[in-house]
């Protein structure tokens, strides 16, 4: 007896009618925005060699990847991320292209999620990558595109900005191994503040251990910068990063975000390749981030094509659900008379 011929694999589902229309609507709105901003579409293979994602700071656990082998026995994976394939593509196909390079995509990714996590193993992402550009102007360009993309789907979003560099500078002052720093980062990301306190209390007390303890609470509006200043005295990297974030916050405030723009120094993205500003967007009544991005200036060095870069990925499925929940998609059911 066939046990699985009437169901889809765990973490996947059929998409019908209004959901199809909603997903198509989100994809069309976002890709239109990207094209109008001068970005060119690229499509990478659904399968990549495992080596593309086996970089030291790729931060995608191998157990989250769907794997197979090709006809020569080489290990391949179903694409779990889009930034790394685009970094590979840029390094191998676009090196001679004038910089900066503006690329966009709208493709599914595949992740082997934990059981009962409630997340889909197949998710469509739409996003952009600005490669070969650094500095404030480039960061504003990409984050402004993210804001426009979100606004095309809902007004009920909140954009949080943080800095991977700020956490990295604090962590570098701790007398611990790289693996321990990653444990601390993961603990902050998971918001397990009790475990974070235990980890840091086991270390010699310093201004830096106290700063990391308080990172998750450095969240809010412009007042957060004054709170963070106490940890930056005498530390050039922290001071420079704080000044940059203050300047970026001021520039982004002009986009009309009002109280939807927040500073979050506890925002430590999972992807270890981020080196500067990081940002996430959340929508009311939707638990997970619907958009995530940041600056990753060292990633392309792993493909022998060093250049600065920044980008973001929007969760098309999540934004489509938001459109449906907001009642912004009309019924598309068609009825025909029996012949």
Predicted regions and their residues:
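Acidic, His- and aromatic-enriched active-site or binding-groove loops in soluble protein domains
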Residues: 64-70, 176-195, 283
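Phosphate/dinucleotide-binding and metal-coordinating scaffold of catalytic cores
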Residues: 2, 98-99
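Extended alpha-helical scaffolds
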Residues: 153-156, 164-171, 180
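Internal, well-ordered alpha/beta segment that forms a basic, Gly-enriched binding/recognition surface
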Residues: 138, 159-162, 171, 188
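Beta-rich nucleic-acid/ligand-interaction surfaces
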Residues: 47-62, 162-169, 267-276
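TRNA-binding/sensing appendages of the translation machinery
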Residues: 1-84, 92, 140
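Positively charged, Gly/Ser-enriched RNA/tRNA-binding surfaces
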Residues: 19-20, 25-37, 48-49, 83-96, ...
């Amino acid at each position: 007896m066939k046990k699985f011929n009437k169901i889809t694999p765990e973490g996947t589902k059929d998409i019908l009618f209004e959901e199809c229309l909603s997903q198509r609507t989100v994809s069309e709105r976002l890709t239109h925005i990207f094209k109008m901003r001068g970005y060119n579409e690229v499509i990478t293979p659904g399968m990549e060699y495992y080596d593309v994602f086996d970089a030291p700071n790729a931060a995608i656990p191998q157990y989250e990847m769907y794997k197979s082998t090709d006809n020569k026995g080489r290990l391949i994976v179903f694409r779990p991320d889009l930034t790394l394939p685009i970094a590979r593509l840029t390094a191998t196909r676009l090196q001679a292209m004038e910089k900066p390079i503006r690329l966009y995509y709208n493709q599914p990714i595949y992740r082997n999620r934990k059981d009962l996590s409630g997340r889909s193993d197949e998710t469509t992402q739409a996003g952009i990558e600005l490669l070969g550009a650094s500095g404030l102007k480039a960061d504003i360009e990409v984050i402004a595109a993210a804001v426009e993309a979100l606004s095309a789907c809902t007004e009920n979003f909140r954009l949080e900005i943080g800095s991977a560099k700020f956490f990295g500078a604090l962590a570098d002052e701790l007398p611990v191994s790289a693996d321990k720093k990653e444990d601390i980062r993961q603990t902050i990301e998971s918001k397990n503040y009790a475990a974070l306190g235990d980890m840091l209390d086991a270390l010699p007390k310093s201004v830096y251990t106290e700063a990391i303890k308080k990172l998750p609470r450095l969240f809010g509006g412009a007042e957060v910068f004054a709170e963070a200043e106490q940890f930056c005295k005498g530390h050039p990297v922290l001071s420079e990063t704080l000044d940059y974030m203050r300047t970026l916050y001021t520039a982004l405030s002009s986009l009309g975000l009002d109280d939807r723009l927040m500073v979050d120094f506890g925002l430590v993205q999972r992807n270890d390749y981020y080196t500067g500003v990081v940002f996430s967007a959340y929508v009311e009544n939707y638990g997970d981030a619907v958009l995530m991005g940041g600056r990753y200036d060292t990633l392309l060095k792993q493909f022998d094509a060093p250049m600065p870069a920044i980008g973001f990925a929007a969760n098309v499925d999540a934004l489509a659900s938001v459109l449906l929940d907001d009642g912004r998609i009309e019924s598309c059911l068609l009825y025909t008379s029996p012949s």
